[in-house]
Curated annotation (Swiss-Prot):
It comes from Mycoplasmoides gallisepticum (strain R(low / passage 15 / clone 2)). GO terms for biological process: translation. The gene is rpsG. Keywords: Ribonucleoprotein, Ribosomal protein, RNA-binding, rRNA-binding, tRNA-binding. Gene3D superfamilies: Ribosomal protein S7 domain. GO terms for cellular component: small ribosomal subunit. CDD domains: uS7_Bacteria. This is Small ribosomal subunit protein uS7. One of the primary rRNA binding proteins, it binds directly to 16S rRNA where it nucleates assembly of the head domain of the 30S subunit. Is located at the subunit interface close to the decoding center, probably blocks exit of the E-site tRNA. Transmembrane segments: none annotated. Belongs to the universal ribosomal protein uS7 family.
C-alpha cells in the first residue's frame, strides 16, 4: 500500500477547443499512447457533428456527456458470505470518467465504417438522449433502484 494518496494530475485543456473535457475524451479514445491519432479521431468527429447538426460541436458534446453521466452506481459489498450490490452516489469526477468511458467503449461497438463516424453518431445520439451510452446509464440506474433495499449498507 502507498504511504500517501497519489495526487491527481492536472489535465491541460486541448489547444483547439480550450476544454479540459475534450482532452479527457481524447485520452479516453487513445490506445497505446497514440494521442495524435486520438486527436484526429475526435476533431474529425466534431467536424462531422458540425456538418450533420449545423450546431457547435462542443455544445453538443457537453450535452451528450451530461446526458450519459450516472447519478448512482453499484458497488459490490461482501457481508456474511453473501455479495450485495449496494447503490452509492457517484462523485463528480467519476461521473465524467464513467460517461467518457461508456461513450468510447459503446462507440467502438457500433457498426459504422470508421471510428470518426462511430463517435460522431454516438455523441449526436447521446445529446438527443438516445443511443447505447444513455441506455447504459438507464440500466445502471434501474439496477440501483432494484437494489435500493441494500442502500443502508454503507461503503
Amino acid at each position: 500500500m502507498r504511504k500517501n494518496r497519489a495526487e491527481k494530475r492536472k489535465v491541460l485543456p486541448d489547444p483547439v477547443y480550450n476544454s479540459v473535457l475534450v482532452t479527457r475524451a481524447i485520452n479516453a479514445i487513445m490506445l497505446d499512447g497514440k494521442k495524435g491519432i486520438a486527436q484526429k479521431i475526435l476533431y474529425g468527429s466534431f467536424d462531422l457533428i458540425a456538418q450533420k447538426t449545423q450546431k457547435d460541436p462542443l455544445e453538443i458534446f457537453n450535452k451528450a456527456v451530461e446526458n450519459i453521466m450516472p447519478r448512482l452506481e453499484l458497488k459490490v459489498r461482501r457481508i456474511a458470505g453473501a455479495n450485495y450490490q449496494v447503490p452509492t452516489d457517484v462523485s463528480p469526477e467519476r461521473k465524467v470518467t464513467l460517461a467518457l468511458r461508456w461513450l468510447v467503449t459503446l462507440s467502438r461497438k457500433r457498426h459504422e465504417k470508421t471510428m470518426l463516424d462511430k463517435i460522431a453518431n454516438e455523441i449526436i445520439d447521446a445529446s438527443n438522449n438516445t443511443g447505447a451510452s444513455v441506455k447504459k446509464r438507464e440500466d445502471t440506474h434501474k439496477m440501483a433502484e432494484a437494489n435500493k433495499a441494500f442502500a443502508h449498507m454503507r461503503m
